[in-house]
Each structure stands twice: as structure tokens, then as C-alpha cells.
Amino acid sequence: MPLTLSTGKHDMTLDPVWTNAAGMLGFSNEARDLVDLSRLGAMVTNPVSLAPRSPARGPRMLEFPGGFLLHTGHPNPGLTEVLRRHRRRWARMPCPVIVHLLAQTPEEVGRMAERLEAVEEVAAIELGLGETDPQTVAAMVTAAGASQRPIIAHLPLGSGAQLAQAAARAGAAAIALGAPRGALPDPGGAIVHGRLYGHAMLPTALQAVTQLARLVDCPLIAGGGITSRQAAEAMLAAGAAAIQFDSVLWTEPEAVLESPTA
């Protein structure tokens, strides 16, 4: 069944109850030839920072059994340029647009959220959060409330229940769980840090959803290792209210873009 996120002033409904994960499909319609965006409940943009960010140096992708590590540095031209290039495209998108914000401080979050409040093409904000402490999570989510759009607090798998609970208490409309952090040696032996993707993430993700569904008072959006309809159905049965698909959209989108049994 559809999922509606509301702040009292702005509502967003996910129907169907899945989106892409941030970083998978670009900033607007760049991946339209890869994925039929009308089959998503919403499209989540690549991470957007206040100032421009350059690509990471060194290896971008390292494989391991069951998945791969991705190290990009979240390159983007900054919020002002993203709005200039993509706002008109968002207005023509076949599904709602969720802007994923990448910020270092609550002040940065507040500045970006306030800017997005005036952008009617944005249905909600997803706030990327790292493995930090509950006080920082609460401050970041509170600052994002300057937009009065529904706020989705995005946490990496393995962050712990305290961070999810802090985000919910601070006003997050939903908690999204996504790619955990990890590290691998590159061919030269240097340690590369990044996000982990692939079906090997599924057991960890399913365990996290099962536990958090009992502990937080807002909807959970499950992500990590979901590469089949069966995995999506398992997440919903475990207590997730919606799903985020990541690398499967690059390789086999048809495997997941069917309606799971809610």
C-alpha cells in the first residue's frame, strides 16, 4: 500500500513504495534510458552539497565476493548549480523528486533546506547522515526542518538504533537505511574506504530492519542488498514501509521493478 509522509504543510506519497538509492540515477532524468522513472514511487537525486565537490582520487570501484566497494567522493556542482541545471527537469519528471542533501554541519543543512523550501518541484528531502552520535543526528535533522518538507534521515547500515531513534525524535518523517561503509585494499595495497553494495549486504540489512521496526516510531525505508522481488518482499514482511534499490538498477532493473506484496 502507498506510503504518505507528511509534515502538516507538505505531503509526499510513495506509490509504489520504492525509490532508487541516492547516487544510482543522477540528479534528474540522466538514467531515463536505463530505468523507466514512472515505475518509481519517487526519484532520489545524487547527493548534493552546498559547495561543489570534486571526484575522489584513486580507484572508484573494488569488487569482493557478493558485492563491491564504491568510492566516488560524491562529486556534484553544488546546490545552486544543481538547481539551475535540473529544476526544470524535475518539473517534468514522471514521479516526485527527493533531493538528497550532503552536509557537514547543521548550519549547512539549514541553509540548503531553507533554499529548497522555495523550490516547489522538490517533494521531500533525504538527509545523508554518517556514523556519528545521537546529538549530531538530532541537530542535523532539526536544521533540515527549515524546509518544512518531509525529511528522510538516511543512515548507513550498522549505525545502531540510537541514531535512528534520535532522528525520529528530532522530526524525521522516515528513516532510510542504506549502504554501509567499508574498506578494501586496492591492487597496490592502499586501503580504500567507501560504500558497500551487492547481494551480500542483504542479511545485515534484513536484520537491521527487523530490529529497528520495533524501536522507532516512524516508517522505515529499507535498502542494501535488495536485488530481487523476493528480497523486497522479505523487507516489507520484516517491517519496512518502503524500499530503496541501489546497484540492481544498473544491472537488472526488471528484477525488482514489479509490485512486491505489501
Each predicted region: which residue ranges?
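Glycine-rich phosphate-binding active-site loops on the catalytic face of alpha/beta enzymes
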Residues: 45-50, 123-131, 174-185, 225-259
